[in-house]
């Protein structure tokens, strides 16, 4: 059993096996990923770096279940997500995957408060007002709560 920074590193949290993804631009096939296999253990931090067009965003969309590979499989916390039905995948994604886009995606017509509680409401839960206020304070945006 390997220990790093207080984490027990014996459990594979994410595994991608033989991922391939090709985009089709008219009569031209553009391979983005070819035979990509990787795994990440619990508590690991990983940077994915490469030149523009090297497949980083494609890989992250597939690992985050936003896109499907042409071939291969993705397993998160022991559950194979490739090939899941839409409803099951949506539920799994909502409960287990956090995906942050390069450009922030706030709803401009909503207040800061409404943007913060949106995921809680989508999950069918009632937001804890004190927790939301604490979060807004921690983020330094409590003055924007109703803006």
Question: Each predicted region: which residue ranges?
Answer:
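ABC ATPase NBD coupling module
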Residues: 27-30, 81-98
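Short coil-to-helix segment of the ABC ATPase nucleotide-binding domain corresponding to the Q-loop/switch region
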Residues: 110-119
